Amino acid sequence: MAIDPQPSSPSLSSETIANDTIGNDNNVNEPSVEPKTQEHQHTVPPRLSRIYSQAHHISQSFIDQNYPGEGTTQVPYRINFLPDDSQNAQLPPPMEEVGICGIKQVIRAFGISQEVATLGISLYVLGFTFGPLIWAPLSELYGRKKVFFFTFMVATAFSAGAAGAGSIASLLVLRFLTGSIGSAPLSNAPALIADMFDKSERGLAMCMFSGAPFLGPAIGPIAGGFLGETAGWRWLHGLMAAFTGVTWIACTVFIPETYAPYILRKRAQHMSKLTGKVYISTLDADKPPSSAAHQLKNALTRPWLLLFKEPIVFITSIYISIIYGTMYMCFAAFPIVFQQGRGWSQGIGGLAFTGIVIGVILSIISFAFEDKRYARAAQRRGAPMEPEDRLPPAIMGSLLIPIGLFWFAWTTFASIHWIVPIIGTVFFAWGLVLVFMALLNYLIDSYVIFAASIMAANSALRSLFGAAFPLFTRQMYDGLGVQWASSIPAFLALACVPFPFLFYKYGRQIRMKCEYAAEAANVLQKMRSLHVTVTEDDAMNEAEEMWRARTHNSHTSATHSHGHRRSLSCTRSV
């Protein structure tokens, strides 16, 4: 399975998608000569030792290979990974949200309203809208490791700054910047997993990663509730700064560069300097050069084009955004229901999020079994699976979400034991992640070469919903009461239940009538039959040309038909 958890996301490059669709063909045009030197043995884990060691070292074995080409500017040597290449990330080895709990302290410290304090959550999540659109293309230009190093370093500084903020304005700005800078893992961590694991291997890894954006905001209040109650809100941000700083150091020390096009591009440059001959990566050989400005322009505009022109993308993104926003609404509602309604302390109130944690864990376990079911079904079929085959978990999840939300809404009375509404949140979280992961997989399989832009659009839209929903939660609960206010998202989820069923039954017919989905299917067929790699830019241009030609033919046909009818009318009148 390949998905953008929260995020997920512009996370998969076109090279990764292409390799997945036609098989693991990294060795096409690769010389069969074995390396002449033995790799040094390391004590770090086997997979990491292969890709972390000699990160920028060009050994004589690289230069001695018989690469295709002549080594000239016109016909450069085309390099690829060697059979036992230490930097090939896919070579197999040998046999967040503790700030939610500090809202009351922030209100007292700065003398502000509940709505302004809630902006700290909303602006943080709003940063998820813009950050991945920038960090994903930059990681393809400058590598995953450099982006991780920079973003974790700056996010650590901003979190530390938030801990010492002297005004609410500076705190809100720092929260937004922390979300924007710290959102790099939402796009680049799935890409790193795709770099390291083959499509058949990455299902469980992606499953675990996809649960993290839901587990983080749920686990955070459990620990943060007691910390905020005893040490104050500044220590919550201090804890986040410490955690991000440790992560920054760990990423710097242990995470190697994994993006194959960047590794081979840098290797070709180094080998060209060493030998005086011209080398080029096989992954770059047939592509026009692409600047950072060009990639950023596409990253900022193309997702919105696909979002509003493709019905499948729009409907699934709206559905995911509603349930994602509902999750953040729950984070704002739980203090109202359990602390205000039942008199729980801030620390004990954080324990109400335990149901969300259990539901997310159940969904990860469910997807581990679903991954095996999907693999067996693909093996039995003996042919590529249809995107609609990804939807059964979404069908199940679409039913669990309204069940869990209605359960929670109408068991929040003080006369009912507190465990009962928390059990309802288990079903909600279970269904939420099932729908989230299944629909993202469906979008990726439906749009293949456009997957990065589709994930970017989905991530941006759901982050907007996640930022907006908490802002009106307090007013909604004050105006409607706990039960009916909690039922509003349940009714929205209930209205969305038919979507997975309709896509499962009619998805193929709908896809073939969508401009870019149809082009993605054509590109996928071309890559499978001809074993060629097609970039997202190429596919976009081809889709637009086909659409223009189809529109022109339709206009010409309509004009001809109108002229013919007019001629007949004139003949009759004569």
Swiss-Prot record:
Its main location: membrane. GO terms for cellular component: plasma membrane. Residues 1-44, 552-574 are annotated as: Disordered. It is a multi-pass membrane protein. GO terms for molecular function: transmembrane transporter activity. InterPro entries: MFS, MFS_dom, MFS_trans_sf. It is found in: Cell membrane. The keyword Glycoprotein applies. Glycans are attached at residue 19. It comes from the Eukaryota. The chain crosses the membrane at residues 116-136, 148-168, 176-196, 208-228, 235-255, 318-338, 348-368, 394-414, 419-439, 449-469, 484-504. Fusaric acid is phytotoxic to plants such as cotton and banana. It has been shown to induce programmed cell death in plants. In addition to a mild toxicity to animals, fusaric acid exhibits acanthamoebicidal, antioomycete, and antimycobacterial activities. Keywords: Cell membrane, Glycoprotein, Membrane, Transmembrane, Transmembrane helix, Transport. Induction: Expression is up-regulated upon exogenous application of fusaric acid. Residues 9-30 have a biased composition (Polar residues). Belongs to the major facilitator superfamily. DHA1 family. Polyamines/proton antiporter (TC 2.A.1.2.16) subfamily. Efflux pump involved in export of fusaric acid, a mycotoxin with low to moderate toxicity to animals and humans, but with high phytotoxic properties. Constitutes a self-protecting mechanism of the fungus against critical levels of fusaric acid within the cell. This is Efflux pump FUB11. It comes from Gibberella fujikuroi (strain CBS 195.34 / IMI 58289 / NRRL A-6831) (Bakanae and foot rot disease fungus). The gene is FUB11.
